[in-house]
Structure formats: structure tokens, C-alpha cells
Amino acid sequence: MTVAEMSASRSRSLRWFGVAAGLLLLQIVILYAMGRIPICECGYVKLFEPGVNTPGNSQHLADWYTPSHIIHGFLFYWFAWLLFRNKPFSMRLSFAVLIEAAWELLENSPIIIDRYRTATTALGYTGDSILNSAMDTVFMALGFLFAARVPVWLTVVIAIFFEIFTGWLIRDNLTLNVVMLVWPVDVIKEWQNALPQM
């Protein structure tokens, strides 16, 4: 590869990283237009919200659902690699950000908020703060970057650990979240409802 080709490749990569950042910014703008609150109504920001079915859940920088978004990054990395393995890494990252941002917008729409409230244990869920939603996308991107730099087996082990740990601790994880959102199971809901208040 010549110097000119390397320069052009670097320029394309930077443009795609710019696209990823632009998608995150667009997510924030659309959430604001949807009427989402910028930060928790409590008026302050926590690094981590330890509660599950509490008013602070999904309102701060991170919470017990953050591992699920990191796993999103693992999954999106593999998916993007399958679809665009010969494309720039930064383009694949932009693709992942697009999917995550689209989900975040859907998740904070009335139809999905109502679905969470009726089909899952999240009876008091009113949607994410803009800060929390944006950080979900950031954590997905971190998971994507991590998956790009470590062996597949390590990514799989960490994903399984996250699922088992959060499943044990809060009786919820990415797998259970998808199941309860798509095809609610009463036995699982009863088990989750029996979780002691955290």
C-alpha cells in the first residue's frame, strides 16, 4: 500500500468514526424531541445505580443492565464482521451504533415502555433518561471494541459470566429480557417479582 493509499484509508476510517459519533448525537437529539428527560428527575447523576425496580434505574450513567449493552457490542461485532468483513472497522462500528441507537429510540417509545410495564416486572418503568440511553450506546461501543481485540472464547466467557451473574443477582439479564418482552412466561415473571428490594 502506497503512502497515498494509506492516507486515503485513514481518511475513510476517520469519516466513519465521525458517522458513529454523529449517530450518537442524532440519538440524543431525537430522544430530546421525544420528550425524554436529560438526566434523572432527582437532579443529580450517579456513576452507578444499584437499584433495580427503583426510580433511579435507567436514569444514571450505568446500572445492572449495562452488561446487557456490552453484550450487544459483542454480538454486533460478530454480526458486522459476517456482513462487512472486508469493510473498514470504523464502518462496522458505525453499523453497530446505528442498530443500538435505533433500539434505544424504540425502547423509549410508548409502545415498548407499555410493553415493559405490562409483560415484565418493570411495572414502574417510564423510559430512560437521555444520559442513560446515550451511555447504553457508549457501553455497546466499548463491548464492540473489546470483542475486536480479544479471542472469541474470551468474549463468549465474559458474556456468559455477565448473563449468569446478573441473572443470579437481579433475576434479569439480556436473555430473560428478550424472552419476557417477546413471549412473557408467567413462571419467570413470578420468580422475578419475588426478588427482594435492592
Curated annotation (Swiss-Prot):
InterPro entries membership: DUF2585
One GO cellular component from the entry? plasma membrane
Please report the record's description of how this protein sits within the membrane.
Answer: Multi-pass membrane protein
Family, per entry: Belongs to the UPF0314 family.
Q: Which Pfam families match?
A: DUF2585 (PF10755)
Chief localisation class = membrane
This one is known as UPF0314 protein Atu8092
